[in-house]
């Protein structure tokens, strides 16, 4: 028998580890390619393994999704609250993170790997038998792609700058029912499909569409009102060659596609794209000469006539957000002029707490969350698509460098559909992943980016939690790191993730988020 050497990890204090945990979470946000920015609620557990040249941290982080897309490349503290009338959502998560801090002059932090689980708790918080408003978190977002396409067409008709954009991924759909209205709030990412533009600046965007229907409406093809706002983000390269550290900033576009210069420049925190093949994601020394400040996006405001009309309106330049409002004409008559300036169709959604979160999906085969699925224990043996017991994934993670089935790094987005020569069956030969129609896993490779990065990290979206349920823990196994130790030994080596919590953890929840604490496991093994 072979004796595998292992050194005991040192429990450490969650409170003193928080600054490093914040940096690690920021790296996770910068690495991801879909979903919403995580903000740190608390450090739930912390261990370390120190050596002369580096210290490896093993962290458990309780997080909450913000309303900002990861495409914005913002720090979560720079994610301004949504000041519109649309509801916000409560989506919580927990991440198990391994990160290494090096003892160099920059105290460089490297993100080695992470696994996260997320779930919406909005319905559990807001829906009661006496509530006049009901919130539903729509798990299957794909049926709303057509609605997103139509909303984007409205937007494109008002601005030539967006003419070559197409819907990339429907991220989040929420239904709010109350009174005489049913509103659907649809968030989706978009991609610039102009080849001449894409090869110079791979531009992506993020849109929010509010679709309003009569409460009895069964046809979701033609909403009575549409409001849409979009932002565009450009991935431009700045920095030294050795570090390959382009900054990821926004490009403000006017209605003619030109940059807007009417707004003062405001510095933003920003991050780096994932490292190239074979590297981990890390911070590093600042760019030589600093980085030019980023200006906020120009998002003019306008109102839109019904689908099918040719009339357009100028964008008033004194506004800083794009809201295109669409109202179909009553029975064959076009409306005579736009609605009152700034008026939301039928007012805000009915009063009450809105639901929060991205469309949860069942986790695929792969390193699933720890423990049982959120809605009761699985039947005897491994469930077909739910999270198997901790430490026993049915197929294990995909081979190193290969994303799970259907989530490849290949440039197969709305602009370039997969060829017949390389379909899902070809990807499946390289890696075991979720079967078709179960796109539960969102890793950094998911999404249609033309970059070929080494895949690390996973985010599993689980079904919404109900009252009395707690968030299943993420998988604690990182076999890729342990395997890599034997071929590329590190000092200190990566150890198995600790199974016993530190006595000096967890942190207390901030009072602002105290209502979320009941959805996290209250105790850890000690």
Swiss-Prot record:
Pfam families: Cystatin
Signal peptide bounds: 1-8
Basic residues bias (residue ranges): 260-269, 328-346, 438-449
Sections of the chain in a coiled coil: none
One BP annotation, GO: negative regulation of endothelial cell chemotaxis
Region feature Interaction with ATP5F1A, mapped onto this chain: 31-74
Compositionally biased spans, kind Basic and acidic residues: 408-429
GO molecular function, one term: heparan sulfate proteoglycan binding
Region (Disordered) location: 243-449
Superkingdom field: Eukaryota
Keywords on record: Blood coagulation, Copper, Disulfide bond, Fibrinolysis, Glycoprotein, Hemostasis, Heparin-binding, Repeat, Secreted, Signal, Zinc
CDD domains reported for this sequence: CY
Compartments, record wording: Secreted
Keyword Translocase: no
Assembly notes: Interacts with THBS1 (via the TSP type I repeats); the interaction blocks the antiangiogenic effect of THBS1 with CD36. Interacts with THBS2; the interaction blocks the antiangiogenic effect of THBS2 with CD36. Interacts with HPSE; the interaction is enhanced at acidic pH, partially inhibits binding of HPSE to cell surface receptors and modulates its enzymatic activity. Interacts (via the HRR domain) with TMP1; the interaction partially mediates the antiangiogenic properties of HRG. Interacts with kappa and lambda light chains of IgG molecules.
PANTHER family linked: FETUIN, HISTIDINE-RICH GLYCOPROTEIN
Record's comment describing the protein's domains: The His-rich (HRR) region contains approximately 12 tandem internal repeats of the 5-residue G[H/P][H/P]PH consensus sequence. HRR binds heparan sulfate and possesses antiangiogenic, antibacterial and antifungal properties through binding Candida cells, and preferentially lysing the ergosterol-containing liposomes at low pH. The tandem repeats also bind divalent metal ions and heme.
Role according to the record: Plasma glycoprotein that binds a number of ligands such as heme, heparin, heparan sulfate, thrombospondin, plasminogen, and divalent metal ions. Inhibits rosette formation. Acts as an adapter protein and implicated in regulating many processes such as immune complex and pathogen clearance, cell adhesion, angiogenesis, coagulation and fibrinolysis. Mediates clearance of necrotic cells through enhancing the phagocytosis of necrotic cells in a heparan sulfate-dependent pathway. This process can be regulated by the presence of certain HRG ligands such as heparin and zinc ions.
Name of this chain's protein: Histidine-rich glycoprotein
Gene name tied to this protein: HRG
